[in-house]
Each structure stands twice: as C-alpha cells, then as structure tokens.
C-alpha cells in the first residue's frame, strides 16, 4: 500500500541531496518518477508544479502549434488510459491547449470544474501506479499553491490504494495537515554536530589539514549547515586565500583580513558576483527555475552559442 514521507529541514540542510540519493539508490529498479517542483514565485499560480510536470512529460513546447499540442495531449491521455472527452477537455484546459473539446466544459461551473480536474489528476496518479510502482517527489512544499495543496490532500487520503510513495520536502515554517496520518512518516533533518561538520570540511580539503583558526572560524560561522560549509570551503579554495601544501593548507594573510559572509545567501551572492561575464547567465538561469533546458536558456540570453558553451 502507498506511503508518504515528510522531510523537514531548513534551507541548505540537505533535503534535495537526500532525494537525489534515494533516486540513485533506486536506479535500475522498474518504477515511475514524477516530480512537482514548487517555486517561490508561483505560490498563487493554480497547480503550477503539476502543470509544469505535465507539460514536461507530454513534451509540450511554447513553439508548438495548436494541432501539435493537441496531438501530444492525445498521446499522453491514451498512454494513461483516458479516452472520455470530458477528462481530455479538463487536461486541455489545465494545460491551456486551445480547441480541444472546450465545449465539453461550457456548462460546468468553475468550482465543479476545479473539483473534476483534481479528481482527474488523482486518477492520473492512480493509473500510473497501476502500471508500475511510482515515486512522487514534491520539492519545497512550503511554496505550494492552495490548489496543489488540496490535490496533495486528496492523494494522501487515498494513497493506500495505490502503489505510490510520496516524498515531500519542506522548511520548518510549513505545517502539513497530514503529519498525524498513520501511513505518513515525518523526518526532520537537523544541523550537523561539530564533529561531523569537521569531517565534511576534511572531505572538501581532500584530508589536508586547515589552520586551526580557519577551521574554527568556519565551524562557528556555518553552524552545522552542510551547504553553507561546502559553499564556504569552495569559496576559500577558489579565492586563493589559502596556500596548499603537501598535507595541509596555510593562510596567505591574517585571518582578520578574511571576510566570511554572515549567511548562506550572502555567500552565494558573493560567489555569483565573482563569476564575471557568466554572472548574468547564472542570474537568468535562476530566474527561469531550478531546472531548464539548454534550448530555453539559449533563447533567453543575448549571446552566441559559442559564448554560451
């Protein structure tokens, strides 16, 4: 029967890395994967992560003609056993595909249309899981729009009848209503203790010893946040503030001259600032989203292929 795992942790604590590790562990297994990626810029966009997933799995592109989009939708529906005109019209409306039996919904109220759409999406997951076990990953659920939150509640309420594992990641300020369900497991990722933080630093330096004062400054500033430790170490190694020896590093200047950003966000911005001409590309990529194709980036930036490569 289906299960749900809720994975809670602050930014940079390792939620996404744990998700990647799970997928690596399942490599070679026969299962379907779905990913709903939430966005801080789309918290009020109805079903944004679901629409993004469906457009990707259907292969829809902005430059597709209306007939091409209709054809791709028909293939997606047929692959998942949907042949009734109303359900196909619901998906067409959700994906903003024009001219595909829209008259089927002409007399349906907005509230009824929303309810029917959510039920169709639950059935989509059910049929997918009927073919093979499925993994649904919902990343950054603290940015879920209300309608997708409603959808997830419906899925979790019925998941015991599906061969489906739902993994939901979120930050501590999100309070999932499903935490007390018997088929839901709640996990919290905490900050690393100093010993494990030191082990992570040693991994980053290839086992070479840092000056004690530098190591203590890193441990104090990062306070056990793994991504902060990794990014700060990368920054120190990139900027040449440390001289590398055979089995250790040495400071090139007094520690007081080293400026260590006060937060992970400030550190990341500092590293972006050092990218030079690549900075604008990185910023455009960040504005697009966590994942994007080369073609989309190429169409967005005003440089040549050779420069982008």
Q: Where on the chain are the PLM-derived regions?
A:
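Short secondary-structure boundary elements
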Residues: 1, 6-13, 18-22, 50-53, ...
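Short hydrophobic/aromatic beta-strand immediately N-terminal to the Walker A/P-loop
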Residues: 4-8, 35, 135-137
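A short hydrophobic beta-strand->loop->alpha-helix junction that borders the nucleotide-binding pocket
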Residues: 8, 34-43, 76, 189-190
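P-loop NTPase Walker A phosphate-binding motif
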Residues: 13-44, 48, 52, 60
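A short beta-strand-to-loop transition that corresponds to the Sensor-1 phosphate-sensing loop
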Residues: 37-40, 168-173, 232-236
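Conserved Walker-type P-loop NTP-binding/catalytic site
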Residues: 46-135, 163, 179-182, 187, ...
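Conserved Walker B catalytic segment
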Residues: 126-166, 298, 306-307
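Sensor-1/coupling segment of RecA-like P-loop NTPase cores
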Residues: 151-188
């Amino acid at each position: 029967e289906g299960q749900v795992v809720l994975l809670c942790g602050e930014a940079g604590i390792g939620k996404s890395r744990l998700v990647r590790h799970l997928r690596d562990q399942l490599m070679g297994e026969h299962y379907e994967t779905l990913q709903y990626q939430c966005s801080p810029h789309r918290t009020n966009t109805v079903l944004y992560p679901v629409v993004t997933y469906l457009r990707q799995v259907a292969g829809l592109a902005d430059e597709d003609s209306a007939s091409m989009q209709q054809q791709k939708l028909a293939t997606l529906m047929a692959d998942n056993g949907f042949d009734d005109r109303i359900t196909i019209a619901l998906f067409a409306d959700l994906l903003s595909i024009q001219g595909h039996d829209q008259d089927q919904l002409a007399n349906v109220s907005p509230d009824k249309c929303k309810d029917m759409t959510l039920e169709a999406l639950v059935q989509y997951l059910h049929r997918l899981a009927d073919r093979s076990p499925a993994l649904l990953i919902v990343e950054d659920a603290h940015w879920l729009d209300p309608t997708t939150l409603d959808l997830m509640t419906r899925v979790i309420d019925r998941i015991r009848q599906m061969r489906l594992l739902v993994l939901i990641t979120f930050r501590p300020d999100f309070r999932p209503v499903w935490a007390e369900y018997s088929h839901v497991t709640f996990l919290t990722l905490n900050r690393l203790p100093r010993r494990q933080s030191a082990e992570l630093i040693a991994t980053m330096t290839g086992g070479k010893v840092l000056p004690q004062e530098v190591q203590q400054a890193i441990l104090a500033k990062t306070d056990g946040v793994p991504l902060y430790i990794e990014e700060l170490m990368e920054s120190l190694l990139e900027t040449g503030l440390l001289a590398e020896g055979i089995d250790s590093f040495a400071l090139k200047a007094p520690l007081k001259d080293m400026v260590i950003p006060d937060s992970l966000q400030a550190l990341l911005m500092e590293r972006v600032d050092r990218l030079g001409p690549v900075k604008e590309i990185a910023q455009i990529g960040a504005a697009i989203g966590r994942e994007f194709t080369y073609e989309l980036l190429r169409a967005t930036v005003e440089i040549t292929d050779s420069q982008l490569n």
